[in-house]
Amino acid sequence: MERHLRVLFFVEGYTDIRFVVGLSSICRLVVAVPSRPYVESGLKQRLAQSSASVRVDEINGGRLGFQLRSFVYLWQRARDFDVILSQEALRGSLNANVIGSLQGVPVVMSMGSSPVESFRCRRIRGQINWAKAVLGETVIWTLLRINGRLAARCLGIGPYLRDVAARFCPRTQIGLHHGVDTDYFRPADHAERAELRRKLDLPVEKFMIFCSSRISHEKDSETVLKAAALARTRGLDAVLINLGGGYKEFLHLAGQLHLPEAGSWVLGRPAAHPMTELADYFRAADVLVQASLAEGLGFSPLEALACGTPVVATAVGGMAVQLKGYARLTPLRDPEAMAEQFLWVWANPDQARAQALQGREFVIREWNRQKAFVDLLRVLETVVRKDQFADKRKRNGN
């Protein structure tokens, strides 16, 4: 694919190696990213090990320092690019949109979470008081409205976030972010699952519940742990494995909940490389679980379905919209209901796998990786053409 568009991918926090590699395949790419998350997330090392053609500009500083330095960076560099792709729709995108508007460079925002719903989870968890909740939500809505007016386009990742973004940005459509590589995330039969578990040093004969969610305010690890413990009391010989940068916090939480013999069945591993190691865990599992208080989409359930692995998930946000008919959905914060779904998958393995394989067809059709980047390139090219046409009309005085 010819890469002619000059794109600046502007990131205010963490991002995914899969998206950066895919984006680099469709454009001449520069990534501007805060230094600390770039290193801490492992992205710097993973990019160095990849064959992606990309230049990375690291911007130092904490929240305020990054905001100021990134403003200067964008002011100096914006016109070097045909389009700026800005991650999320808050403070980082404010810099991108203001400078893009002043310098005539179109900005496309990509939104992977619902900012207000995610922020409200902090209040639900008691992490902030009422006054901070009101102030924070006011600031978020202000940023969303400003960015929504200035952005050339907003991509909500999936139909749920498309509808959320449309409330503040009239030029909104569905984006697929990095999509799902359905050749890499593929089904494994019973014998292959057993072999994968031996390779990964996981219990071969146990019912394996896989949780790839990080510990954060919008995730609901407590419900996952309680549900697995309940299912075990009803005869399910299960292990629960968490994979990610926060796995030690997950293990600590299991201890805090005083779950019976948690040390013997709650397992944790560091994050696996999402392009070379992660799929084996999905393929080896009996079920993937994701519980959330708020969720814009949830890529892990889609990746599990691509592997033909049954999914149990909270019916909230984008998961309620995307997974209906393909996953076992449960009410918010309901360990009892989630435990019952674990037991159902255990008792009905063929039916559960058949449902998941229907989900795989859905993922291939709607979320495959190739489609994701073809669609993204089309959006970027359309925005650039419209901007160039508007600029030409302005010069001609029309």
Residue ranges of predicted features:
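Membrane-proximal helix-turn-helix segments that form the acceptor-binding/catalytic region
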Residues: 75, 133-154
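Short hydrophobic beta-strand element within catalytic cores of glycosyltransferases
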Residues: 310-313
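Conserved acidic donor-binding segment of nucleotide-sugar-dependent glycosyltransferases
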Residues: 327-335, 344-349
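N-terminal subdomain of nucleotide-sugar transferases
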Residues: 1-52, 398
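Conserved donor-binding/catalytic core segment of Leloir-type glycosyltransferases
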Residues: 203-219, 225-228, 241
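Aromatic "clamp/platform" in nucleotide-sugar-dependent glycosyltransferases that forms part
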Residues: 89, 293
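Nucleotide-activated donor-binding/catalytic signature segment of Leloir-type glycosyltransferases, i.e.
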Residues: 251-272
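Short alpha-helical donor nucleotide-sugar binding micro-motif in glycosyltransferases
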Residues: 280-285
